[in-house]
Curated annotation (Swiss-Prot):
Keyword set includes Repressor: no
Pfam family, one: NusB
Encoding gene (name): nusB
HAMAP family the record matches: NusB (MF_00073)
GO molecular function: RNA binding
Domain of life: Bacteria
Annotated Gene Ontology cellular component terms: cytosol
Naturally occurring in which organism (per UniProt): Persephonella marina (strain DSM 14350 / EX-H1)
Family label: Belongs to the NusB family.
InterPro entries: NusB-like_sf (IPR035926), NusB_fam (IPR011605), NusB_RsmB_TIM44 (IPR006027)
Positions of transmembrane segments: none
Protein name: Transcription antitermination protein NusB
Length: 142
């Protein structure tokens, strides 16, 4: 059921990574990423990609502020491009999206981390930061 979301998250991750390196328009970058596979993507997947990117685009300064507040002994600007992209995606989906299955968000982000970075310490780092962000927000909302 949620495979379209996992594929969408991967495309959003790649879009955010490219955006961080080159700048530009998030939606143009995303369209460039999917131009060769668009016909193979379901409408649901493409709609979800647009939904996530729209939300990240609207909330990026706030997402970055949240990350800065929750990074221990790291500066956001010093993180690698893939780590920053994964954390931005994770924070958006955990705190700003209306998706109910937050556990699935964690699992997909960590799977992407393993796939694209393949460093156990980075997987722990991403998990730790996202867990801290999510727990801190839960405390505020209680």
């Amino acid at each position: 059921m949620g495979k379209y979301r996992k594929k969408a998250r991967e495309i959003v991750f790649r879009t955010l990574y490219t955006y961080d390196i080159k700048g530009g328009d998030l939606f143009e970058i995303m369209e460039d990423h999917i131009k060769d596979i668009r016909g193979k993507l379901s409408k649901k997947t493409v709609d979800y990609i647009y939904s996530i990117l729209k939300g990240i685009d609207e909330h990026l300064p706030e997402i970055d502020d949240i990350l800065r507040e929750n990074l221990k002994n790291w500066r956001l600007e010093r993180l690698g491009y893939p780590e920053r992209a994964l954390l931005r995606l994770g924070v958006y989906e955990l705190l700003f999206s209306d998706i109910e299955d937050k556990g699935r968000v964690f699992m997909d982000i960590l799977d992407l981390t393993k796939c694209y970075i393949d460093n156990p310490d980075t997987v722990k780092f991403i998990n730790g930061v996202l867990s801290t962000v999510y727990k801190n927000r839960q405390k505020v909302n209680q």
